[in-house]
């Protein structure tokens, strides 16, 4: 495990001092994707129809062969705030890969950064040797070298990709993007937006924390973060410190007034894909409209009902797709409703074409949060609490300060000493996860599989069958989930607050008899956290 300098000590000291170029891929940069020759081929006609509904704020790549280059670039969060970012293809987020269900895709990763990198396909059940985990499924890709990922995309939905090499720092610097697998029988919408949410630090003196091995890297900044100067954070929990460290919230690499609006027309059916690439949960509110949550982590909700004036809490690593009909003309703000200092900077305008009305947002901070375990219509799922399981496993998730540094444990151990979950191919597996941390939230992510959530705090799930790959567990909560061991390999099972993962909250699902198809390269500093 990586050695860390105690975060409270670093924060106290620091804050006191602080007074896609492949011929088989189609590029659709910016907002203008309508200049394709619709008469050339049937494929181009399909792309033209798709471009009418997509309104991306980043490059969208289609096809089945892609090139992603990891490199350093400057990111303008707004007119006054510039960051040195690590990127795929020079942007944060990186390009969206838009692919069709059933296709085999190939992604060439070129590394132009000074450190090794990988790509992990978050949520996609890829073969084990394509999962992008340094030292577990491959060696990290060294500077000036390349690696080719190739796999079939069978499960439609909203996913994202990010580096899993020293992810606590590399993802924090911007090394991520989105991937959408379109179903064969996709129900059409008029507009299809993707919003990738993240947080950034203001104080560039915290960059020292990165080189010192802190759990949360810093970014360069353009202004002084003096409001938190002289603040003593010693004794604070991770949950208390994080919002004070990350005070700039972003959507698609922009913050505040620089966030580009989502343009709609009255009567249009609109889908918004929300992806949380950051460390903090985001409670998002869509004012003035009823909406349905059609999927979570890419997996459909059964008969989702319309809801209004409820907050959608999106934890790190989670994805939610929502749909609404644009039937209330004006200019609205899809905004964050948390008490975090950075919340005010995350408000995405939804603007009706041709309307000049003033921006509208709800000032109420007391709106209820959607309970996704009670949302949607109940139906028979793949698993139940009454099934017979081949393997049962308990994960006690906790925070430990007993050795003078904050660590995050599974069953009292930190990775790589956490006990693995040993399975055989075909096993039915039931896992109980309990968050015993007094204040810290743990969004637990399983690689290579989806799991079905069976119960929460001892009560069976009452809404739609809930299938996820990332589950947000609040302090004191207990969940039981189940999955089938149907994808042989060695798979990470970890907290997607990557600071918690880097400080120990990781384990592995290990298949009996499986042997990786690579040899550890001793010249590569593989860092799977």
Residue ranges and their predicted role:
Residues 1-5, 10:
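Positively charged n-region of N-terminal signal peptides that target proteins for export
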Residues 21-67, 171, 176-208, 213, ...:
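Extended terminal and domain-junction accessory segments
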Residues 194-266, 275, 398-400, 408-413:
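Acidic-aromatic/histidine active-site loop/patch
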Residues 64, 103-107, 268-272, 427-429:
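Structural beta-strand segments of beta-rich domains
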Residues 130-133, 139-142, 152, 232-370, ...:
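Histidine- and aromatic-rich segments of cupredoxin/plastocyanin-like copper-binding domains
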Residues 16-19:
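C-terminal motif of bacterial Sec signal peptides marking the signal peptidase cleavage site
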Residues 28, 69-182, 281-312, 332-344, ...:
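Histidine- and aromatic-enriched segments that form or immediately flank copper-ligand environments
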């Amino acid at each position: 495990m990586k050695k860390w300098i105690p975060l409270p000590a670093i924060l106290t000291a620091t804050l006191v001092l602080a007074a896609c170029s492949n011929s088989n891929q189609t590029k659709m940069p910016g907002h203008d994707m309508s200049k394709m020759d619709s008469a050339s081929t049937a494929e181009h006609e399909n792309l033209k129809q798709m471009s009418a509904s997509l309104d991306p704020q980043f490059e969208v790549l289609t096809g089945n062969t892609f090139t992603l280059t990891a490199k350093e670039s400057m990111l303008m969060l707004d007119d006054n705030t510039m960051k040195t970012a690590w990127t795929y293809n020079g942007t944060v987020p990186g390009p969206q890969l838009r692919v069709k269900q059933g296709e085999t895709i190939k992604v060439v990763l070129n590394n132009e950064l000074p450190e090794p990198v990988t790509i992990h396909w978050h949520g996609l059940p890829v073969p084990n040797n394509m999962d992008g985990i340094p030292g577990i499924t491959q060696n990290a890709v060294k500077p000036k070298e390349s690696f080719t990922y190739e796999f079939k995309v069978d499960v439609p939905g909203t996913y994202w990709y990010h580096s899993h090499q020293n992810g606590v720092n590399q993802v924090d610097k911007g090394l991520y993007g989105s991937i959408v697998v379109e179903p064969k029988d996709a129900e059409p919408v008029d507009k299809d937006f993707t919003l990738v949410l993240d947080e950034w630090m203001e104080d560039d003196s915290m960059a020292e924390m990165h080189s010192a091995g802190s759990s949360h890297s810093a970014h360069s900044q353009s202004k002084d973060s003096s409001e938190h100067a002289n603040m003593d954070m010693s004794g604070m929990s991770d949950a208390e410190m994080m919002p004070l460290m990350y005070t700039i919230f972003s959507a698609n690499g922009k913050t505040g007034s620089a966030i580009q609006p989502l343009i709609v027309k009255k009567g249009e059916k609109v889908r918004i894909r929300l992806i949380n690439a950051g460390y903090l949960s985001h409670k998002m509110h869509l004012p003035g409209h009823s909406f349905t949550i059609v999927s979570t982590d890419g997996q459909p909700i059964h008969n989702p009902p319309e809801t209004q004036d409820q907050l959608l809490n999106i934890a790190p690593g989670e994805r939610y797709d929502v749909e609404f009909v644009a039937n209330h003309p004006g200019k609205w703000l899809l905004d964050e409703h948390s008490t975090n200092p950075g919340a005010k900077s995350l408000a995405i305008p939804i603007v009706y074409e041709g309307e000049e009305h003033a921006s509208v947002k709800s000032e109420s901070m007391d709106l209820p949060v959607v309970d996704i375990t009670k949302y949607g219509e109940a139906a028979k799922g793949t698993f139940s609490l009454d099934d017979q399981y081949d393997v049962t496993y308990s994960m006690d998730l906790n925070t430990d300060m007993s050795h003078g540094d904050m660590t995050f444990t599974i069953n009292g151990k930190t990775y790589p000493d956490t006990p693995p979950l040993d399975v055989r191919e075909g096993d039915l597996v039931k896992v109980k996860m309990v968050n015993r941390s007094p204040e810290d939230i743990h969004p637990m992510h399983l690689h290579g599989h989806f799991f079905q959530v069976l119960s929460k705090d001892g009560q069976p799930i009452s809404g739609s069958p809930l299938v996820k790959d990332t589950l947000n567990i609040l302090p004191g909560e207990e969940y039981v989930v189940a999955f089938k061991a149907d994808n042989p390999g060695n798979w990470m099972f970890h907290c997607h607050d990557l600071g918690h993962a880097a400080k120990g909250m990781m384990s592995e699902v290990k298949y009996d008899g499986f042997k990786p198809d690579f040899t550890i390269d001793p010249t590569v500093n593989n860092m799977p956290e």
